[in-house]
């Protein structure tokens, strides 16, 4: 980086801290330790060393992203080609995030639907286990307004059919938080 220059009036440690590259903001304070260790006395020797380190790091990252000798070939083959610029990369990232959010909402809706179905099934099992509610299970009526009619019809149906049938189903004693673990 031949554009490196010392800030006017800077000397000693201040010279290292005041180094700037044309077109770039000043180096953050958190990286000043790197400059001090790399400079070794002369500021120009330190920058050359940093340039070599940066070039080597860039080569390694390029090889890894291309799947070169670094062993990243399988990973690079699974990823789509790099977008040509930052705007394209951001657009691609935004598109992937929207897709992930839609998938997340879809899975959440399916999970909630499954939870509601399980709660209905538990209610049906509990209704079936009670001795006076066989009609509700057979016809799917669970409305409180029709409770009177259900009881009357179930009593009438029992007399017509003869001895009562055993419609008991196994009732699980799962709490509301255990149903997820049980379903997996």
Curated annotation (Swiss-Prot):
Q: For bias kind Low complexity, which ranges apply?
A: 167-184
| Record field: transmembrane | none
**Region listing for Disordered, in residue ranges:** 148-184
Residue ranges annotated as compositionally biased, kind Basic and acidic residues, are 154-164
Which cysteines in this chain are paired by disulphide bridges? none
Which protein family is it in?
Belongs to the FAM89 family.
Q: What is this protein called?
A: Protein FAM89A
Q: Which organism is it from?
A: Homo sapiens
């Amino acid at each position: 980086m031949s554009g490196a220059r010392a800030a006017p009036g800077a000397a000693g440690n201040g010279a290292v801290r005041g180094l700037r590259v044309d077109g770039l903001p000043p180096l953050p304070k958190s990286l000043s330790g790197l400059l001090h260790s790399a400079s070794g006395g002369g500021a120009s020797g330190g920058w050359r060393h940093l340039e070599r380190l940066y070039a080597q790091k860039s080569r390694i990252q390029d090889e890894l992203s291309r799947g070169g000798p670094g062993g990243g070939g399988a990973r690079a083959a699974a990823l789509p080609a790099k977008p040509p610029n930052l705007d394209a990369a951001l657009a691609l990232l935004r598109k992937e995030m929207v897709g992930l959010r839609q998938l997340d909402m879809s899975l959440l809706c399916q999970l909630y639907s499954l939870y509601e179905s399980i709660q209905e099934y538990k209610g049906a099992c509990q209704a079936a286990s009670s001795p006076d509610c066989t009609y509700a299970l057979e016809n799917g009526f669970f409305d409180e307004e029709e409770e009177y009619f259900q009881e009357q019809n179930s009593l009438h149906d029992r007399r017509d059919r003869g001895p009562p049938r055993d419609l008991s189903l196994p009732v699980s004693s799962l709490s509301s938080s255990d149903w997820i673990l049980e379903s997996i």
